[in-house]
A protein has these predicted regions:
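Core catalytic region of metal-dependent phosphoesterases/phosphodiesterases
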Residues: 15-22, 27, 32-145
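Active-site-proximal beta-strand elements of phosphoester/diester hydrolases
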Residues: 23-31, 154-161, 240-244
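Structural motif
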Residues: 23-24, 60-62, 153-155, 221, ...
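Active-site glycine-centered loops adjacent to acidic/histidine catalytic or metal-binding residues
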Residues: 29, 67, 105, 159, ...
Length: 296
């Protein structure tokens, strides 16, 4: 019998064991760009960098669940590095500490290809872009991960575009349209890309529903991204978690696991009474014990 796409991906995904002493942060859909009108992260870059620094300083393992880099609209990863060198340097520190796992989504699926490897191998290692080479040249880029919590609960981590037909089965066509059509229409004429779940509430709900159905059918919790809609269910609800994105107006969302508990986090800019702007970390969901989640 032919396996469904999520079951197939899960069956070949590496399994990582962790316990209540481990701390994990999930972030997806950063869409790091080239600093032009095509760069969706730019307005929230300082918020994202603050979150990333927090996770590094506090010994979290950082799992990026796809669409970290906007490689549909931007052809060359070096152009993204030149816009965000400090972010890449911090990701490299996570890697050197063995605290970095990177998955690909539809917008950076090229990272899992030989074409991307050749792009990295061609980087002049005498230049500053050496950080890009050091980050990517031997970094596994996964389609999925399985996190095993003390043999009590397994979490399947995946971007989520696999259940979104136009962004998975028709990825070359979708990436062409986004790079050469929608990026122009959005940047110059203000049109909204209706093919993306991130921009279409109808498509977002369809993707959420498909992922929830798979979770229930397979008795397997999922942590995903893709839809840009964060969610942390109650323990008596279907355990489909979504870390949201980094490109909502003035905010970034993430999911944290600490001391065996899972939480949904919002990072946003707040103004203090003295007029100083600061980035605030706010728990907006949970914390809930992982072991309390049941399939209904």
């Amino acid at each position: 019998m032919k396996k469904d796409i999520l079951t197939r991906v899960m069956s070949k995904s590496p399994e990582i064991y962790f316990n209540k002493d481990n701390k994990i942060a999930f972030i997806s859909d950063c869409h790091r760009g080239d600093g032009t009108y095509k760069d969706d992260l730019m307005p929230n870059a300082n918020i994202y960098m603050t979150a990333l620094n927090y996770y590094y300083r506090n010994n979290f393992t950082y799992i990026e669940i796809g669409d970290g880099d906007e490689l549909w609209k931007v052809k060359n990863i070096e152009d993204i590095y030149n816009t965000y060198p400090d972010i890449f340097k911090l990701l490299l520190k996570f890697k050197y500490d063995n605290r970095l796992y990177m998955l690909y989504g539809n917008h950076d699926e090229i990272k899992a290809t030989k074409k991307f490897k050749h792009m990295i191998d061609r980087i002049d290692r005498n230049e500053e872009e050496n950080d890009v080479y050091n980050l990517f040249h031997d970094l596994p880029i996964y389609e999925g991960l399985v996190l095993n919590y003390e043999d009590l609960k397994r979490l399947f981590v995946i971007h989520g575009h696999q259940v979104d037909k136009i962004n998975y089965n028709l990825e070359p066509f979708a990436s062409f349209i986004v790079r050469y059509v929608w990026s122009f229409l959005e940047g110059h004429l203000g049109f909204k890309n209706g093919t993306s779940p991130a921009r279409s509430n109808t498509k977002r709900k369809k993707v959420d529903k498909k992922l929830q159905q798979w979770v229930k059918l397979n008795n397997q919790p999922i942590v995903a991204g893709h839809t840009h809609r964060s969610r942390l269910p109650q323990p008596d609800e279907i355990p489909y978690f979504n870390d949201g994105c980094c490109i909502h107006p003035y905010s970034v969302s993430s999911i944290e696991i600490e001391k065996g508990k899972i939480s949904l986090i919002k990072w946003s800019i707040k103004s203090l009474e003295n007029g100083v702007l600061t980035v605030r970390r706010e728990i907006i969901g949970g914390p809930e014990l992982l072991v309390n989640y049941k399939i209904i």
